Each structure stands twice: as structure tokens, then as C-alpha cells.
Amino acid sequence: MMESQKIRIRLKAFDHRILDQSTGEIVQTARRTGADIRGPIPLPTKINRYTVLRSPHVDKKSREQFEIRTHKRIIDIVNPTPQTVDALMKLDLAAGVNVEIKL
């Protein structure tokens, strides 16, 4: 493959423990096949907050807030070997982790 080739993997999840476990599996697989790794780089956590009224009828001042946090990581694989690409395609990650791969 070309010298300047790079694979960028973006991972998103609501649970940071599952996300860290998945990044560890990807890094371990890439290192085992002889690729050079940059990361995992933690990106800012996006927090979506939803405010709803507690009462269905009155009490506008009484509200409840819910939030959902989206944790993100980036892993760059520099100079991947064909074995690295095959191993990453066969890798089975936990449910709840969104994976985006750019070449």
C-alpha cells in the first residue's frame, strides 16, 4: 500500500465503558497485525438535555431534566497492512457502538 495511506475510525456510544472496551479491541487488533496507531483520541462529549413538565396539568415551575451523553473517540491507523484491514473487517464489536471508517 502507499506510504501516506491512513484509516480513520470514529466511534460513538452512550456508555463510555463499552466505548473504551471497543477502542481497546481495535488498537490491540491493529498492533497485532503490524500497523502504526495514533490514538485513541477522546473528543468532547455531547450532552443533549431534555426538560419536561412534571405535572400534566399545572405547576409550570416544577420541571424535570433528562440528559443523554454521547461519548466519541478517534483512532488513526497509519500505514495499514492488508492483514490489518482484514482483521478490522472481521472484528466483532459490542452492540451500542457506532463505527465510522474513512480511508
Swiss-Prot record:
Signal peptide: none annotated. GO terms for cellular component: ribonucleoprotein complex; ribosome. Keywords: Ribonucleoprotein, Ribosomal protein. It comes from the Bacteria. Pfam families: Ribosomal_S10. The keyword Kinase does not apply. Part of the 30S ribosomal subunit. Involved in the binding of tRNA to the ribosomes. This is Small ribosomal subunit protein uS10. It comes from Magnetococcus marinus (strain ATCC BAA-1437 / JCM 17883 / MC-1).
